[in-house]
Amino acid sequence: YTTILGEVYLNHELSNTENVGGYFSHHSSAGGIEGLRLDDDFTKTNLNIHYSQKLRDFSWKVDGGFDLQTYNWYGLPDGFYTDAQISEIDSGHAFHSFYAGGKLKFDDAIIKEGSVRFRRFGDDQDSGENRFVAKVSFDVPVQDEIISTEFYIDYISGSFDRSFNTTDELKYGNVIFGLAPSYQIKQDDLTVNLGVNLVYLNDNEFDESKFFIYPNIEASYRLVDEILIAYGGV
């Protein structure tokens, strides 16, 4: 069988502060495994393009791309289907997705960085999913100390043409709001990050909401300088 595999990376410096680049990959096979009763070819294609710029006080980057994939589910149990039934089976399945996002990073400000990303996923069986994620990291001064904090929103919604047991359309969706403050303590070779993750979850389809509190604690100790570090977290 014939297989094609290729990748291309491109990067170009437009100026001292601007950069543009891209990535393309393709992997496919014409199939031809002996003894199969169904098609077994597949393709995977990916494309990404990005642009970035670094200014005096901040830098930013935007990117976007898409993924295309086709597969064949060619496994069959012996003696379960007749030749007529096998000839009617459509074993192909195609997936596609596209995404776009951006990131902004400040060099010396209370707000350290922020990012957004949207992705749309679907297939040829009328399934689809949308996801949007936004994050912002900032420092909160408390007297002479700094509390590093991250706030994020994670939204997802999707649907299937039908559920497994019925022909009714199956939908799902929820949105998460999270706040994660953290305080760092350093003493000699010991570093401790004390934090907590506050999460609010709202289920859009079932009209339910929940609130969670998770510990976010990490500690590291340098046993041998630049060679061995002990680490633990919860």
Question: What positions do the PLM features span?
Answer:
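Residues on the lipid-exposed face of transmembrane beta-strands in outer-membrane beta-barrel proteins
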Residues: V8-H12, G22, L47-Q53, H96-F106, ...
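Surface-exposed extracellular loop regions of Gram-negative outer-membrane beta-barrel proteins
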Residues: H12-I33, E150, Y172-D203
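Outer-membrane beta-barrel strand-turn architecture
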Residues: E13-N16, Q53-D57, F106-I110, V140-D144, ...
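Flexible loop and strand-edge segments within Gram-negative outer membrane beta-barrel domains
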Residues: S29-H50, K61-R131
